[in-house]
Amino acid sequence: GLYQRNLTNWDVHTIYENNRTYEEKNNHCINCHNYKNYSTQDMLFHVRANHGGTIVIQNGKAKKVQIKDSTIITAGVYPSWHPTKDLVAFSTNKTGQTFHLYHPEKIEVMDEASDLLLYNPGKNEVKHILRTRNDMETFPNWSPDGKTLYYCNCELDKVLDLETMPDSMIAREIALRYNLIKYSLKKVDFDPQTQTFGEPQMVVDAPAKGKSITLPRVSPDGRYVLYTEGDYGQFHIWHKSSDLWVKDLQADTCYALKPANSKDVDSYHTWSSNGRWIVFSSRRDDGNYTRPYIAYFDKNGKARKAFMLPHEDPEYTLLLLRSYNVPELTTDAVTIPASELRECIYDGDGEKAKYTK
């Protein structure tokens, strides 16, 4: 489910909770919630499996949409709201998973294909930003001025012979070469007035040093790109090698946030609206469950030692047999009732987005 915690006290409120017990006809998953400019006035989240779709909330109203088309790989996946326009950048991913028998990291989640989409909620229209067979693009994130879109990119043709390989073999071959799949950080320029994009540009070539980047997030002042770096792949929540890094766009330098990192997973992250705090998912306590950690980020671009999100009962999080993930910081609370969200989710398939070129 989705929950919100008031960081000024101990209050926890349920935004929406799916079924706690398995129900064949109603079982579904809630994930990938995202907010515009750190506010809940414009927000969205995905529903997977039964009653699937994307729930978009604007002007206090919720609607379900299907961001699908014959040219789109699956549907909208990882989102990022444009800061000034009524637009959302999505990746669209064909994702699967495999299980290791002897590797200490038991699950490997991988994409077999991914592209980038631009969605207009007001018009309910969607189009491609980037659509390629040789590259896998994912995790889009806008700069605060809305003129640059950052994303992660894997040059798949450097790992597989795509010229001769049939599509039906790609997933199997990626699984066999899972530790060779590595992502760099790229960007494209964007003109908000004409809504046109420039050509891809390299920002951080992580594969050149044998690493892989995921989850770029630009700081509110536009100076830093916070990202997660690991040894391979793009689902770093399962990778003990994953750490938080930043790219200082002004100084053109990259460095790890060592005081905040740990020897275990440090993965999904978000900035506070003033750029002085970061919240991220970590498995540093037991290696099994992700828990939210908070770290201060000073004006010189340095992080302080991270601490677990406090609870009134200090043992609550450690004894909870559930994982936290996808932490997001907002300046206001979600106010739409859970009953309205449930009605929106259960009441039909929703409106299909119109595909444009």
Residue ranges of each PLM-predicted region?
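Sequence signature of WD/YWTD-type beta-propeller architectures
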Residues: G1-K357
